């Protein structure tokens, strides 16, 4: 075909001459390549020829037999300028007649082309409607592409839209484990609980993603939330034999007394499912025992009593309970004044006092509760470091004469006492102020 040959040669004059003299139908589709002349020119990236053809009446939204528009072709070729040219000449940014190519927006997202996606969105491309099988926000999450997710959210993509195959965007992001995308979705108003779907914390445990579990707990998600079967995150972690997540949940205050709809506690789950390690069983028992000694409130008295009877009814678990009690008594024996090492579990002891107590500890004597002690010591050292740095910052930066004289006249011990009243965030603010 002469016109196609002229386009291939980028011969604008010949293209114009053929169109005018041969009375060419610009909407005809070539049987060999399934392209119209405009499709062909766009695929070649010849802007001047495309402009001329549009001026001569070529349909900017003409679709070939595969239902692919010129805009789709420009997007697949990552040709930003051509995309903008077609949009400026009336290209439909939501054009889609089948499930193969999707909308131009979906096509741009699949190509992971940020600039083209931005151009389409600025021109009003629809972020909500699902013309094919996936929403644009779902596609961006599947690609693990944070910039595209942010771009879509900025243009109003619905974070609570439902996809029949992938569910809600937040559930998909949790399955993929992208922390930054999860944060973005939560920031933009994700509903924390969907009917017929597990809570976000349950979902993260089902995916065995410790980082996501920690993120959600840090953002205030209830560590003791129940799913439709009454299972808490701890029930689920025990059932799935996830030792690391069991440790996290215990450290974050998971209540082992809660019973599910079948009146089963998480401890009982160890026996019901029969696939759990001795480590999980001992983790639960050790926490149940220390919580009882510390008088930690629980949500279910019946569940607590059931756990206790379950432990004492078995020789091995009862023997382990006695070992736990021995270590607790050792912690109570390590004292300075009225404070004991056991107080670290209740968070009733200042960091400097805790470190003094730790100097009296023979750590190998504590096998069961060693991690609790080590974690408390780490936190105490971190806090002492913050206090020390805050003191240095204040000493170096207070310059006003009146304030300076007042500060210098305060005894060092009192200055440190003042700093000890501050929370972690306040101390960080002081340290980061210079």
Swiss-Prot record:
Pfam families: Ank, Ank_2, PRANC. The keyword Secreted does not apply. GO terms for molecular function: aspartic-type endopeptidase activity. The keyword Metal-binding does not apply. InterPro entries: Ankyrin_rpt, Ankyrin_rpt-contain_sf, Peptidase_A2_cat, PRANC_domain. Keywords: ANK repeat, Repeat. PROSITE patterns: ANK_REP_REGION (PS50297), ANK_REPEAT (PS50088). ANK repeats lie at residues 33-62, 66-95, 101-131, 132-161, 165-195, 196-225, 229-258. GO terms for biological process: proteolysis. PANTHER family: ANKYRIN REPEAT AND PROTEIN KINASE DOMAIN-CONTAINING PROTEIN, ANKYRIN REPEAT-CONTAINING PROTEIN-RELATED. This is Putative ankyrin repeat protein FPV219. It comes from Fowlpox virus (strain NVSL).
